[in-house]
């Protein structure tokens, strides 16, 4: 009798242990299933409930072991479906990034327009700008005549003289100042060209006074001389006739007279 009681008590202990393990395994699978279900948007019906089988089998059956191994949910294809869900926010992030870049370009254009300021006839973008060309001032013949006469008197005007001349001609002081600056630059350019022309004429006149004519090339520079061929007497006379007058022409008729 005691032996049978010990055997029944051992069986009850093993059954209670297997039931506790199956219950703990089912609790773990439930917790994992709930955590996975809240983290993803996929319906819960896709996951088979293998871990919720009642512990009808023996103490060493597959229920307790299966409850532990199948604590995590799985898809019927063998791969967890939570890998497909992260791609959606990634693509959304890409589209959002492209939209963000477009918005930033528009913001840059608006900021560029805001920073573009025209100050004193200059376009300034962030403090750096290019000058705007102002329209050229068209002077009348009377104004040009008066300005030229005053320039012949003096090339530089003092401030009171410039103000007086501008008021007399109906111009601004800036217009008078710019006209005198341009006139001085043109005058200096003409004087420089004139001095270079005079120097060239002086060199030409000094070369023409030399005994050798600059228009006639020397004998070794002539094309016939470079070839090395004989130079005829007639061609030599024709080329150097104005500078060479042979004396044998006077002696040639004398033998004929004899």
UniProtKB/Swiss-Prot annotation:
Tissue: Expressed in regeneration blastemas. Detected in forelimbs, hindlimbs, the tail, flank, and brain as well as in limb and tail blastemas.
One Pfam family recorded for the sequence: Homeodomain
UniProt keyword terms in alphabetical order: Developmental protein, DNA-binding, Homeobox, Nucleus
SUPFAM superfamilies cross-referenced by the UniProt entry: Homeodomain-like
InterPro entries linked: Distal-less_Homeobox_TF, HD, HD_metazoa, Homeobox_CS, Homeodomain-like_sf, HTH_motif
Region annotation Disordered: where it falls in the sequence: 194-228
Annotated DNA-binding residue span(s): 132-191
Localization annotation: Nucleus
PROSITE patterns assigned to the protein according to its UniProt record, in alphabetical order: HOMEOBOX_1 (PS00027), HOMEOBOX_2 (PS50071)
Keyword Chloroplast: no
Transmembrane segments: none
Any Gene Ontology biological process: cell differentiation
Any single GO CC term annotated in Swiss-Prot or TrEMBL for this entry: nucleus
Keyword DNA repair attached: no
GO molecular function: DNA-binding transcription factor activity, RNA polymerase II-specific; RNA polymerase II cis-regulatory region sequence-specific DNA binding
Family in the record: Belongs to the distal-less homeobox family.
PANTHER family: HOMEOBOX PROTEIN (PTHR24327), HOMEOTIC PROTEIN DISTAL-LESS-RELATED (PTHR24327:SF81)
Name by which UniProt lists this protein: Homeobox protein box-5
Gene: BOX5
